[in-house]
Swiss-Prot record:
InterPro entries: Aldolase_TIM (IPR013785), DapA (IPR005263), DapA-like (IPR002220), Schiff_base-form_aldolases_AS (IPR020625), Schiff_base-form_aldolases_CS (IPR020624)
E.C. number: 4.3.3.7
Record-given protein name: 4-hydroxy-tetrahydrodipicolinate synthase
Catalytic activity: L-aspartate 4-semialdehyde + pyruvate = (2S,4S)-4-hydroxy-2,3,4,5-tetrahydrodipicolinate + H2O + H(+)
Amino acid sequence: MFHGSMVALVTPMQVDGAIDDVALRELVEWHIAEGTHALVAVGTTGESATLEMREHVAVIQTVVEQARGRVPVIAGTGANATHEAIELTRAAMEVKADAALLVSPYYNKPTQEGLFQHYSAIAEHCHFPIILYNVPGRTAGDILPETVARLAPRADIIGIKEASGKVERVAEILALCGDQVQVYSGDDGAALAAMALGARGVISVTANAAPRLMARMCDLALAGDFVGARAVNAQLTGLHRDLFLESNPIPVKWALHEMGRMESVLRLPLTTLSSVHHERLRESLRRAQCI
């Protein structure tokens, strides 16, 4: 259903911390013009943890309205509590998003059975395309391939964003699930390797700054041209690394400010990128022809 370079959109903010609707709409237009294959609104990179519920839904709605069906919009609707995830997913449905991306519950650390029941309940209550999101480095929990396989027969669970840092997980999940789910890389630096193993694309931080190159790399890889894809990816390796010099989305918001696209404002407890990293990230932006 979804493939290629799916940008994990930042949420632009004004200097007073309010959401910058104009900059957000401009980002959507830019991504569509640059060839981004899908837009992921209000995930981790979109600062979902510090948005109020009304803001969260408003950002999804703005992205959907501006996209106007030209590319799919995937809404981040994960939450610690299952009932809250259901509420957010239903809200995304109401504003006409195309699918939901649900990070696994964090901090409360559910068991594998708890994860199974959590996602099953969301699927049963929402009947909407769901992409699981596994990122143990943030959630302190790991959605194991065997749990994905238990969920895979549910028609509404269509894929997983795999950000465990273990590229072999792509092959493990596909071996257990076949074509019942699609796997998407959640790690820009490993995206090319993941696609070689059968992933259908990447939910990307790097695409925020270099959308055309990320889309080109994915197009080549999914067409089987890994020589060409490696050549493109070589221009992006600095960004893959340096956009994580500090916690995401701190570096990528600074990068977009450096590119003249938006303010580098974040909400506390996130703070702007330390000046000691500026020149290194600036050089990676130059290498990727972003500035």
